Structures are given as C-alpha cells and as structure tokens.
C-alpha cells in the first residue's frame, strides 16, 4: 500500500510449506482488512502500509510503515494493529494496540520461541522488545536497540529466531546474517515510550 490508496488490503492464509518439498503453494483463504483510522484513499496521513507481521497467542499483528504524505520517503513512526476476526466475506477492521514515534520503516517482525521477546527489523536497526507486563502492546515493553551497518546489511526484509539468543536476518539481495545477541554490545533500555 505504498501510496496509501488501496481499498483491497488483506491477508492470504496458506499452509506453511516445506520449501524442500513444495515449489509453490496455494492460498487457503483471503481475509480482507482495513485500518479503522483510514477514511480517505489515499489517507491524509500516509500511515497505512504494512509488511511487518507477526503472530502472538494465535493473533496476527501488523506494524505500519509511515511515509511523508504524498511521497514515498520514510517518516518516523509505526502503529501496532491486531487482527481480531477472520471474516472472508467482509472486511476485518484491525484493532489499534499501540504506537511509537521513533521506529522508522519496520520491514519484518518475529516473536521469540518462548514468547517473551519481539524482534522488529528496520532498514538500519534491530529493535528488541520484552513482552509487555499487561496486555499485548509490545511497543511499551523494555527496549534494546541494535544498530545495523547498512553498508553491509543493505535492504533487510526478513527476521526470525533460531533459538532464544540467535536471530537470522535476510536482505533483498538474498544475503543471510546471523546475530548472536550475547555477542552484541547494546544494553537494554528501560520502559520508555516515545
């Protein structure tokens, strides 16, 4: 939704394929979605684009990318939404859960295997949030930010956990990076919410 004008946003549900056995997969169903704050197409604020999704407690979450209105340029900020319904015959209105003003263009997100940490990938940093004490506003948890050397990592687009301390990051150029969180010098920050 780069221009924030699409009215046909949605999620394709597929079975998780075995990449070694299945060269292609099919959509099981399509879940149309809409952002509750978007009244105009394109929106007055260009805050209705998302490619960073994650699952927590069997719910799908979306992190938005904000753009300078009328342009494709990145703007700081992200909103966290939750998909609460699974309608196929009408739009599923997303629920706004939280927001931050300092995250620029989240491209991927993943919850740790134990469900206690969320990794959010942006073009120049890896943001690690602890599970919130109450509710599901992950953006309110304790934060640890790890800068990424963009000259090496380039256009990063995917993140996943190998285990509780190792993350894998892939970029658009098909390079794969492994991060051992115990080897990265970036102390956690306390609860802070810009």
Predicted regions and their residues:
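Sequence/structural signature of beta-propeller domains
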Residues: 1-194
